[in-house]
């Protein structure tokens, strides 16, 4: 469990679970079930107004354009000036062609532009799996290559299965606009998060742990920064 939400001889800790679903097929006895946890659109607008983030990520799926429109309308109600609206979507589990996925993204693009939002396309190669092994990195790179000529305007970011091996899979002339480390980053810093909790505090309030966490995160990011500085794409 990338969120460390399942301990030996205990149930799933709902406070830590973020719904990746990796445990569902992994349990041989089928003891783990899933349930929805949803905020209505009014609650979403209220939450965003309170937190006032610089950007928001919205996960979407084929055939969910109306639900997407409703969420975007709720974000607009919050009146928070977002710098970017990240849209996360991929092919896995949807039996789509890249062309069909691009049509879905164009639909989302039209919705975003109606509300004056600037999109960032987060191409989910193999969702929430970067900590599983080196091979998961391939799906994100392959999806980026297939969607690059088809996607609507906006930066295309690698996601879903990204890890320390992702950068080695790119050609010398291939430059995605960004990379998101989810499962891999969580695996790297989770021991520090748990240690901070054992100390009765949060990681960001524990100076030594915070410094160690930043060093671990920088180890993931630094190769991309070095690569970026050698090009005109950044």
Residue ranges and their predicted role:
Residues 1-13, 22-39:
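Iron-sulfur cluster-binding cysteine motifs and their immediate structural context
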Residues 16-17:
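Short Cys/His-rich zinc-binding micro-motifs
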Residues 25, 32, 37-201, 205:
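Conserved mixed alpha/beta catalytic, RNA-binding, or beta-rich assembly cores of soluble enzyme
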């Amino acid at each position: 469990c990338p969120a460390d939400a399942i301990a030996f001889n205990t149930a799933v800790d709902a406070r830590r679970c973020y719904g990746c679903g990796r445990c569902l097929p992994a349990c041989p006895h089928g003891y783990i079930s899933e349930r929805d946890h949803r905020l209505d659109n009014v609650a979403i607008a209220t939450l965003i107004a309170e937190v006032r983030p610089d950007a928001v990520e919205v996960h979407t799926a084929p055939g969910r354009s109306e639900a997407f429109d409703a969420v975007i309308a709720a974000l607009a109600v919050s009146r928070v000036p977002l710098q970017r609206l990240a849209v996360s979507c991929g092919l896995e589990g949807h039996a789509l062609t890249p062309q069909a996925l691009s049509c879905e993204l164009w639909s989302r693009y039209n919705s975003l532009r109606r509300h004056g939002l600037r999109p960032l396309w987060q191409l989910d190669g193999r969702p929430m799996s970067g900590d599983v092994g080196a091979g998961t990195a391939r799906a994100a790179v392959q999806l980026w290559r297939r969607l690059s000529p088809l996607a609507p305007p906006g930066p295309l970011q690698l996601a879903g299965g990204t890890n320390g091996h992702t950068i080695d899979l790119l050609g010398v002339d291939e430059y995605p606009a960004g990379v998101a480390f989810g499962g891999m980053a969580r695996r790297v810093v989770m021991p520090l998060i748990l240690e901070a909790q054992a100390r009765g505090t949060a990681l960001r309030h524990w100076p030594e742990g915070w410094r160690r966490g930043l060093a671990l995160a920088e180890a993931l990011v630094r190769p991309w920064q070095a690569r970026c500085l050698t090009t005109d794409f950044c």
